[in-house]
Structures are given as structure tokens and as C-alpha cells.
Regions:
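Structural detector of well-ordered beta-strand residues that form the stable sheet scaffold
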Residues: 38, 115, 143, 164-168
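Generic hydrophobic alpha-helical scaffold/packing signal
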Residues: 131, 143, 155-158
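Catalytic alpha/beta core domains of metabolic enzymes, predominantly
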Residues: 149, 153-168
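A short, conserved beta-to-alpha structural element at the edge of catalytic cores
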Residues: 140-147
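N-terminal capping/lid subdomain adjacent to the active-site entrance of alpha/beta enzymes
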Residues: 1-115, 121, 125-128, 132-136, ...
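Short, surface-exposed acidic/glycine-rich loop or hinge patches that mediate macromolecular interfaces
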Residues: 121, 147-148
Length: 168
């Protein structure tokens, strides 16, 4: 689905350039002066390498992003991952995920939304277990808990958690 939307955006861009108009004018006009956006957490260690295993580095990164004006932060609480692997997350990983979310929520308070994206890497049962452990941290959404295109599995997860399920 991502490839289709990317292709559509490219087509709109081409049409806009040919017409000499911004795309928003072609699709009905300007609606907002500014829009809220989120950023993904890319914590780095002292060597400048991305390090997704240290909750303290993730907290540091979250605070820097908030200083830049972001009010929504997306991250994978269950990484490292292998997209479409459909694996069952271990208790150790569940505890680590909860620790990440607890520390980030404590650092940002209610000043920032947390968005979880897990790259479609889990079975429905595993996604449900993770969602239920992370509900206390009040995430705005849980994106692709199971592989995209598995509507029944997404519905199964959505029925067992208060966290809104997203895809895209």
C-alpha cells in the first residue's frame, strides 16, 4: 500500500508542476496553516551509531526531539525486528518494551504523544500481549502490530486492547 500512495503523490506532484500550482490547490484548497507531525526516535550512542537497545538513549533522544518542537514521537518498543517474521515475543522482550515505554513516558509526561510502530512483526497473540502491557503509557496508536494486509488479525488485536490500531 505504501508504494501505491507514493506513486499517487508523485503523480499529483507532476500534475501540480505542469499546472504551475501547489497540489493543495488542485485538491480543494488550503485547509490548515500548519499541521502537527511526528518524528521517529533515532537514538545514537557515544560513537554516533544508532542504538535502539538502550532506554536511556531513547529518553535523551525523545527530549531532544521535544526541544525541537515535536509533540509526537514514534518508536518500535519491541525491536530489534524482522519485518513479516510473525514471531512470538519473549517475556524478556515484553519486559524490555515496557521499560522503554515507562521511561520515555516518565520523561515526556503528558507533553508528548507516544506512537508505537512494530513493522508487522508479530503474531496476533504476541501483539495482544504487548498492547496490554503498554496500555498504561497511553499511546496514541499501535501501528502494524501484525503484517499489513491481515485485516482479520488486525481486528483480533484491536478487539483486545484500548490502544487504537493503525496501518500504513
Amino acid at each position: 500500500m505504501g508504494a501505491c500512495s507514493g506513486l499517487e503523490m508523485a503523480c499529483w506532484d507532476i500534475i501540480g508542476k505542469a499546472a504551475g500550482k501547489p497540489v493543495y490547490e488542485l485538491i480543494g484548497g488550503k485547509v490548515h496553516d500548519k499541521l502537527r507531525c511526528y518524528t521517529y526516535l533515532y537514538p545514537t550512542n557515544s560513537k554516533g551509531e544508532h542504538d535502539y537497545d538502550c532506554p536511556d538513549l531513547a529518553v535523551e533522544c525523545a527530549l531532544k526531539n521535544m526541544e525541537q518542537g515535536f509533540t509526537a514521537l514514534k518508536f518500535d518498543p519491541a525491536g530489534p525486528y524482522s519485518a513479516y517474521s510473525g514471531h512470538q515475543i519473549s517475556l524478556k522482550t515484553l519486559a524490555r518494551s515496557e521499560d522503554f515505554c515507562r521511561k520515555i513516558r516518565a520523561a515526556v509526561g503528558n507533553n508528548c504523544d507516544l506512537l508505537f510502530g512494530t513493522h508487522g512483526q508479530m503474531t496476533p497473540a504476541s501483539a495482544i500481549r504487548l498492547a496490554q502491557r503498554l496500555e498504561p503509557y497511553d499511546p496514541l496508536w499501535f501501528e502494524e502490530p501484525v503484517p499489513p494486509g491481515q485485516a482479520e488479525a488486525m481486528a483480533q488485536v484491536a478487539a483486545k486492547t484500548s490502544i487504537p490500531i493503525a496501518t500504513g
